[in-house]
Amino acid sequence: MTWTTHDYENIPGTYVFDGKHSYGAYPLNKLLFSFNTEECRTEFDADPAAYCDKFGVEGKYKEFVLKKDFLGMLRAGANIYFMAKMAIPRGTSVQDAGAQFQGITTKEFQAKLLAKGDGLVERLAKRGGYWNG
Amino acid sequence: MAKIIGGVTSSHIPAVGNAIANNLTQEPYWKRFFDGYAPAKAWLQEKKPDVVIVVYNDHGLNFFLDKMPTFALGCADTYHNDDEGWALKPVAPFKGDAAFSWHIAESLVEQKFDICTCQEMKVDHGFVNPIRALYGTHDVWPVTTIPLAVNTVQHPVPTAARCLELGKALRTAVESYPADLNVVIFGTGGLSHQLQGERAGLIDVEFDLECMERIANDPEWMTQFSNSEIMRRAGTEGIETIMWLVMRGALQSNVKVVHKHYHAPISNTGAGVLVLENYL
Ligand SMILES: [Fe+2]
């Protein structure tokens, strides 16, 4: 099988969800998609390994799911929006996950985000035309 | 005949819905973001559009990866929100206008946009949250809505240039409909953000502001970028910004900028509100 390459593949720390990922991780994403319903979330919690088997999630994919290794799942082809359906109901917010990806605490991750807004009001005033409170 | 009176942009992130549901909109973290919606809400109150066409992407509620339409149009009289696994409480169903939707679908296909038609379509936070932010939450929504979903989830996703073209075709479609309806287009999502990978937490304020200003006054500027270039700059999830171009393409080339509001960060994103009005 020959997969074409893309210039987005060299963006650092980034796993663009394309056909190659979607194809390889199809059972994993199907499992994650099932978490739209409470019934499936409960069934998974009762026996995660059996739930993986039911969806044909095997090998490294199964290992990542059982370890709740979100970066591992992502690299293996999980879609971030689908992964959130597993993470959020179990108390891992997208910011907790972001912190995990970077190996920092959620507080540190949030502080980095807040810093993006430093000086914003002055900056918008200077550009002009923006509502500014 | 139906006419497009303007366009509005809004973030659609889940945190916005949660902030509204939990009455946090006047908390220090949220206050500036939500206060900046007031002029947009007032504009909608004044104009009272009959129909809002909401351009958004589904994040895995209605569409799974088994079938992934690039562009999909709701063609139903009712659209339901549902549990999407993000701990958001589902809201009341939305009223559609099937006959108008089918007219739009016909016109788009005639104009070579071979759109997917959906007679059942669950709408997720991408559709719901802009409506809540701009109209408040209701048991009976005060406006008829038509969902227009753009795939921004699984690449290949359409280019910025193609989205702008779709908007132009959408304008032709709406303006050839015989009923006297005033229509507003919502462009949702964005601006810069990346949720995934070691680069998570990216926000590029400079790019966001440039996008807002160019989309208002010079939308062709966005079409120079490939999706790789947009993702490099605005993050993988920042690619959602292309949906603003569908809205923009549906308006006249010169528009009145009624309102421009930017805030960062909101959760993991830069967030922009534009109110653009067609000259009569
Ligand atoms: Fe989104």
Question: Which residues does each predicted region cover?
Answer:
Chain A
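Charged, low-complexity intrinsically disordered segments
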Residues: 1-133
